[in-house]
From Swiss-Prot:
Cofactor dependence: Mg(2+)
InterPro entries: PurM-like_C_dom (IPR010918), PurM-like_C_sf (IPR036676), PurM-like_N (IPR016188), PurM-like_N_sf (IPR036921), SPS/SelD (IPR004536)
Family that this chain belongs to: Belongs to the selenophosphate synthase 1 family. Class II subfamily.
The protein's assembly and partners: Homodimer.
UniProt-listed NCBIfam families: selD
Cofactor: binding comment: Binds 1 Mg(2+) ion per monomer.
E.C. number: 2.7.9.3
Gene name as annotated: sephs1
Domain of life where this protein originates: Eukaryota
Signal sequence annotation: none
Protein name: Selenide, water dikinase 1
Annotated GO MF terms: ATP binding; metal ion binding; protein heterodimerization activity; protein homodimerization activity; selenide, water dikinase activity
Active site: C31
Lineage: Eukaryota, Metazoa, Chordata, Craniata, Vertebrata
Amino acid sequence: MSVRESFNPESYELDKSFRLTRFAELKGTGCKVPQDVLQKLLESLQENHFQEDEQFLGAVMPRLGIGMDTCVIPLRHGGLSLVQTTDYIYPIVDDPYMMGRIACANVLSDLYAMGVTECDNMLMLLGVSNKLTDRERDKVMPLIIQGFKDAAEEAGTSVTGGQTVLNPWVVLGGVATTVCQPNEFIMPDNAVPGDVLVLTKPLGTQVAVAVHQWLDIPEKWNKIKLVVTQEDVELAYQEAMMNMARLNRTAAGLMHTFNAHAATDITGFGILGHAQNLAKQQRNEVSFVIHNLPVLAKMAAVSKACGNMFGLMHGSCPETSGGLLICLPREQAARFCAEIKSPKYGEGHQAWIIGIVEKGNRTARIIDKPRIIEVAPQIATQNVNPTPGATS
């Protein structure tokens, strides 16, 4: 996917001050309910969940359900499983078309974290803000829908329905469903000591989109202008937008090639939160230790300048449509990282070895002084495409 021209509201006969991100008070997957609260809310659902003999069932047909990002439900016939996920987010960028693509990629990401590369069907969930004027609604929402549809087509699937409602905030999401044979998905519970942790997108998207909005807010911009330039912010924002819109499908396919043992995608709970959740699911007594944090260029400095506001260095900063965190055999990890960069998969794919799996008690942690890997923007080398339907 090529880089796009910056969204210009006036090209769509909108006021130049129009910002999609103003139609929600939370950003992206920053809408997540805190993990501890979520677990308590789900307790009543889990009480009577899967009363069958789990050991027998697991040996015959793997199953995942409440508390996980994706459900894997054995079907009654044919040795197949239903694999399904749902997700929604709030606007995190101001380009409606790209926001649609990001929303779709975010929904699909939970399938990809299971190593599933084919999606049979998608539904779109759309909340149209009642604060949008008729003109804004009629110009902006079709762009969002088109972006969602285009991303679904890139993923080899289609949108066949959904639900659209009025809402105070713009809400974007969907449901992704597929039917799989057991060899088409990878259960996220087989990490072993000696594995390494690989991450397939840099961190810092939430920081990049936040500071991009600060360009219009002098009192906030003044806090960080000594550590970052306007050009740095613009590049980080564009890079974040392209990363969020990029599907994790290539990484999902390579999980099979290089014998991945477990994976999750990095979204609203941050790198550490999702690593902890994945560690809890492991069959073996292991723990994850993260040594390296790949971060969008200059965003680590911005985060430090803001104190603990973002939580980036502590692993708690939310990501939207982030990369996959994959447990790979040590001897396979470097080959995975090299292969994902191959031009045959298109531009923009990267991966980093960020930590290890060791014997432990199913926890995850970041070392006291992790190495920050500054990830330079790649967009300068890519073509720029205009927004669909814009008038010159």
